[in-house]
């Protein structure tokens, strides 16, 4: 079985290579290809990924390429992890929003729309190549942000293969909870519902016993997990439901905007600076012949990115920070799966006798009765050899229903605007978004984002 990664020259490629290598046996992988349109990125990050993969599974063919046809030829599984436009476009997205006193976070609000304007056309070009060259039963896993919007656009474009939206923002919180509850992760059951980067967690049970009240009453929840950005009072106001970390930009909008404006640089500018310093250091070594030296440089700079996550936005230090590892330690450390783990769980399930719960973005059908059947939602699913069974949440409070419905309307309009390259629909989309909600602001933002030659065909 052949698996292809679109965007395989990204900074996080080593993690993906490690996860695929350790889990290749679960889905019978015989070939892995990392594709990227940047030969420079493949020469650095692709080579580190190659070394990691080959050290773990030297018996499986691993290659990197800039040729999309060769990469996708007869591919059975495809994972997309693209960043179209790179750091420069991200900075532009953020700065345009901030100039108009609104949040420009890369997957949320105005910034998320601007990113989708670039991501969706690029993904759809690859989708056409997948239909032409990949295996007839190929399965696509989309991790390209904004993942929910991109996944919905893929489905509504008429793409004929199975597609799932995957995200690793949810698994981190779920992995942190067993330490607070004194249980194993396999014994904890959680329901998640909503939209990508806009979801809530509810109905926590350990071996069938309800533990929600005990969990939300624990001070450690707000000190030692991704819930550190939220107050216990807010959790109570949300009907005792935990929050996806991206909801910080909604429930703490004013504080987040003030913090970002006062930080002196946006997250995109911070990442670009770290990446530039990393590239300069990596130019002093050859990643193919000096993998340990290249890995050490990469790890040092990667952790600067990882450990500073949400610092500017929340004015908080991240509780769980990572310590640097040597290349050998990285390879030998147990794999936690990440977004590759979700994809592997789905693929393995058809041949398994066990049931496992994951969170994935799929079409709603009748899972959330206040949304349309063709809407893409983010939802807990029970996996078994019978397939994916969405878990209808026990309770969706009215406030959450209204918020989800509002953002979903934005997503519908945004996807339609991008598929049709329609400026008026784009304005309607941003008008509907709760972080914007203004005709004059929406029109100004759309005109600013469209002021680029790549959007010349928009009307």
Regions found by a protein language model. Name each.
Residues 3-32:
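N-terminal Rossmann-like dinucleotide-binding module
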Residues 182-459:
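Long, compositionally biased stretches enriched for glycine and/or charged residues
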Residues 73, 79-80, 142:
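Redox-cofactor binding/interface segments in oxidoreductases and associated redox assembly factors
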Residues 61-74:
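Short acidic low-complexity segments
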Residues 9-13, 39-40, 142-150, 169-172:
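Gly/Ser/Thr-rich loops at beta-strand to alpha-helix junctions
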Residues 25-57, 101:
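Glycine-rich phosphate-binding loop and adjoining beta1-alpha1-beta2 segment
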Residues 160-177:
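Acidic, His- and aromatic-enriched active-site or binding-groove loops in soluble protein domains
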Residues 84, 88-157:
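Rossmann-fold NAD(P)-binding glycine/threonine-rich loop
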């Amino acid at each position: 079985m052949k698996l292809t990664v679109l965007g395989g020259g990204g900074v996080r490629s080593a993690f993906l290579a490690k996860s695929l290598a350790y889990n290749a046996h679960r889905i019978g992988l015989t070939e892995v290809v990392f594709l990227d349109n940047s030969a420079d990125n493949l020469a650095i990050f692709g080579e580190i990924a190659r070394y990691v993969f080959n050290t773990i599974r030297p018996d499986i063919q691993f290659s990197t390429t800039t040729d999309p046809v060769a990469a996708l030829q007869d591919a059975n599984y495809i994972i997309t992890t693209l960043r179209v436009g790179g750091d420069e476009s991200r900075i532009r997205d953020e700065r345009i929003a901030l100039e108009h006193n609104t949040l420009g976070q890369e997957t949320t609000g105005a910034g998320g729309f601007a990113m989708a304007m670039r991501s969706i056309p690029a993904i759809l070009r690859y989708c056409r190549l997948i239909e032409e060259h990949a295996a007839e039963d190929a399965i696509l896993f989309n991790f390209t942000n904004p993942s929910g919007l991109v996944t919905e656009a893929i489905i509504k474009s008429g793409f004929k293969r199975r597609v799932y939206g995957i995200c690793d923002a949810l698994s981190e919180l779920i992995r942190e909870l067993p330490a607070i509850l004194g249980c194993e992760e396999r014994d904890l059951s959680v329901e998640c519902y909503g939209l990508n980067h806009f979801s809530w967690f509810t109905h926590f049970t350990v071996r069938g016993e309800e533990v929600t009240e005990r969990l939300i009453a624990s001070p450690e929840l707000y000190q030692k997990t991704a819930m550190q950005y939220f107050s216990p009072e807010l959790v109570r106001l949300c009907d005792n439901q935990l929050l996806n970390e991206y909801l910080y930009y909604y429930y703490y909008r004013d504080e987040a905007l003030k913090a970002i404006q006062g930080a002196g640089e946006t997250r995109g500018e911070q990442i670009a600076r770290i990446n530039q310093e990393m590239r300069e250091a990596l130019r002093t070594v050859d990643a193919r012949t000096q993998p340990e030296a290249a890995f050490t440089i990469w790890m040092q700079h990667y952790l600067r990115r990882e450990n500073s996550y949400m610092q500017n936005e929340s004015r908080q230090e991240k509780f769980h920070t990572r310590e640097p590892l040597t290349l050998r330690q990285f390879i030998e450390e147990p794999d936690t799966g990440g977004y590759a783990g979700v994809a592997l769980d789905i693929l393995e399930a058809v041949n398994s006798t066990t049931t496992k719960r994951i969170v994935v973005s799929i079409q709603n059908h009748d899972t959330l009765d206040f949304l349309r059947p063709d809407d893409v939602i983010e939802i807990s699913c029970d996996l078994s050899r019978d397939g994916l069974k969405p878990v209808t949440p026990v309770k969706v409070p009215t406030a959450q229903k209204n918020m989800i419905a509002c953002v979903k309307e934005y997503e519908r309009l945004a996807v339609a605007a991008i598929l049709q390259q329609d400026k008026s629909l784009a304005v309607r989309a941003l008008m509907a978004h709760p972080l914007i909600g203004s005709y004059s602001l929406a029109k100004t933002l759309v005109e600013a984002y469209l002021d680029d030659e790549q959007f010349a065909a928009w009307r």
